[in-house]
Amino acid sequence: MAQLDFFASLGHLVGGNVPENIDSRDHLDTFLGNKGEARESIVLEAQGRLCYRSGDYALIPPYKGPVANITKNELGNLDHWSLFNLKEDRGQLNDLSATIPEVLEELKSDFLAATGTFYKTDVKEEELK
């Protein structure tokens, strides 16, 4: 479940009609303490950069800019599509994009379909305040 699912879940709770063309799923049963089903995939965003989580995999698209900042914190800027198995590699140290290209291409296609024109390779780093 993701925060964008609050809309459909709360809509169900109050008996509202939720449009079918929005990305929100009804998880009211989960809110009420019953076991629910998680999303299989989701697009995540941090400081204007997107990534895609599907099952055990994380797909990080290429972005322009420095790989790390002055404190050596990685910024998610790579010059190629990267794929990680989060179940086996939580630190995202082993890029599997060349090892399992069929998974990379499938997730890349799903990511691009989900994000449409929102994915841009040239994102300026936002200053955290």
Where are these regions (language model features)?
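C-terminal cap/loop subdomain of S1 sulfatases and analogous C-terminal strand-loop tails that border
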Residues: 2-82, 86, 120-121
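Amphipathic alpha-helical surface "interface" segments used
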Residues: 31-32, 126-129
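Intrinsically disordered, low-complexity polar regions and short flexible loop motifs
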Residues: 89
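Bilobed periplasmic-binding protein-like "clamshell/Venus-flytrap" ligand-binding domains
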Residues: 111-125
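C-terminal structured subdomain/cap of oxidoreductase catalytic cores
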Residues: 97-104, 108
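Carboxylate-dense, calcium-coordinating segments in secreted/extracellular and ER-lumen proteins
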Residues: 92-96
